[in-house]
């Protein structure tokens, strides 16, 4: 997953 603002549309926690 990608859990920081820079992930943009890929943001996931």
From Swiss-Prot:
GO molecular function: acetylcholine receptor inhibitor activity; toxin activity
Matches recorded under InterPro entries: Conotoxin_a-typ_CS
GO cellular component: extracellular region; host cell postsynaptic membrane
Cysteine disulfide links: 2-7, 3-13
Keywords for this protein: Acetylcholine receptor inhibiting toxin, Amidation, Disulfide bond, Neurotoxin, Postsynaptic neurotoxin, Secreted, Toxin
PROSITE patterns: ALPHA_CONOTOXIN
UniProt family annotation: Belongs to the conotoxin A superfamily.
Known role: Alpha-conotoxins act on postsynaptic membranes, they bind to the nicotinic acetylcholine receptors (nAChR) and thus inhibit them. This toxin inhibits fetal and adult muscle-type nAChR (IC(50)=52.1 nM towards alpha-1-beta-1-gamma-delta/CHRNA1-CHRNB1-CHRNG-CHRND, and IC(50)=102.8 nM towards alpha-1-beta-1-delta-epsilon/CHRNA1-CHRNB1-CHRND-CHRNE). Shows potent activity on the synthetic AChR alpha-1-beta-1-delta/CHRNA1-CHRNB1-CHRND (IC(50)=16.9 nM).
Other noteworthy facts: Five analogs with residue replacement and/or modifications (hydroxylation or bromination) have been synthesized. Four of them show decrease in both ability to inhibit acetylcholine receptors, and lethality towards fish. Negative results: does not show activity on human neuronal nACHR alpha-3-beta-2/CHRNA3-CHRNB2, alpha-4-beta-2/CHRNA4-CHRNB2, alpha-4-beta-4/CHRNA4-CHRNB4, alpha-7/CHRNA7, and alpha-9-alpha-10/CHRNA9-CHRNA10. Does not show activity on the synthetic AChR alpha-1-beta-1-gamma/CHRNA1-CHRNB1-CHRNG (IC(50)>10 uM).
Name listed for the protein in its UniProt record: Alpha-conotoxin OI
Native organism: Conus obscurus (Obscure cone)
């Amino acid at each position: 997953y990608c859990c920081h603002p820079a992930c943009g549309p890929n943001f996931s926690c």
